Amino acid sequence: MKLPGIVTPLIAFVAYAIAQATPNYTSPLDVDIYNPSQLFNVSGPWSLMSRAGNTLYISGIRGFYPSNTTLAPVGRERVLQAFLNMKMLAELGGSDLTSCLRLQVYVTDMYRWRPLVNQVQEELWKDVAPSYPPRTILEVQRLNDDDIVEVEGTFYLGD
C-alpha cells in the first residue's frame, strides 16, 4: 500500500502539533475545547474536538491536507485523508485508533464511497481487526463545499 506523498511532512507537522496541545477554553464543568490552528482552521462557529473526563470527541473531519488546507483528490485519497485527520486529532488529544469508542461517517453516495470507507478503515485498524469500533455510516444529500465524506469519532483517554 502506498500512502500519499504528504504523509512524511504530515508526521513532522503532527509531532509539532502534539507538543502544542493545549485547550483553547475550559468550561466551568471542566470540558476542554480544542481548536488547534496549527492543523487547520475551522470554517465556522465550532471546534475540532473536546474532552470531557476520559472521553475525547472529534467533530466531523474532512479530507484536507493540514499543511495547506486543500482537499485531497476525490476518491480513496480523500477518504484516507479524512480518517488520517481524525487519527491525528485523536493523537493530539492523547488517544489513538485502538481506543476509538465510536465512528460516524457521512457520505454523499453510499454505493460509491462506502466501499472506500471500508477499505480505509480495514487498513487503519488492521492491527486490531476484527475488533473494529462501532460505526454508523449515513448517506446525506450534501456536505460542506460539496465534499464526499466526513468522519467523526469518540475516543477513550484511559484512567
Identify the meaning behind each predicted range:
Residues L3-L84, M88-G93, T98-L101, V107-D159:
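N-terminal presequence-like segments and the immediate start of the first folded domain
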